[in-house]
């Protein structure tokens, strides 16, 4: 029926929209959004120290703000029940993203969240491919956040990271930043020509997590664990 809410049922994968929302919910387990350490990396110890990096703000806590976009495609048209979003602005790397500074980490994470947002709203992997992350990680992120929306779409959606601490901490070569990840899903979902409303109490997905980054080859790299996707599906669905 036109107003039927999407049912999140892990046992049913025949409906592209159900599959898409299931995946979007499941991946809020901390690995996909935050990159829990690279495969084989040494686990973080209990002893950490403040980041030994240059910074100009001192306190970066709160929702990461990101405003670096390419809007050359034309006037943006949000998704409707009749068509998916058109001319969606593409996130581009800020000028300081590769700087070995706290601001550089901040920009790298903001770019990552914006790339996930773009994937959800378009079903494309274009921007995820630009994220500073190992190829296996980028492929996994797209499988969860973009691919399900190649045949279905939702109302305008957004992924953000909310930093809990003023600054990241450092252990060996890894910088860690605790955060809350939040995905806000649009008011409706469309698949196979059918539009269905999503109730307001099922449109926000949040999870507490940690972000791990290392500075390699003159850029910040967001770490990923190649095994997290199988465990991520055990998360609680909230959409």
Provide a role label for each language-model segment.
Residues 17-23, 51-67, 170-239:
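Exposed beta-sheet edge and beta->alpha loop/turn motif
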Residues 1-27, 35-44:
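N-terminal secretory signal peptides
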Residues 30-31, 48, 160:
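Secreted/luminal cysteine- and crosslink-motif detector
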Residues 80-156:
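Core segments of small alpha/beta cavity-forming domains
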Residues 150-170:
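A short, amphipathic edge element
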Residues 23, 36, 41, 47-104:
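Juxtamembrane and targeting peptides
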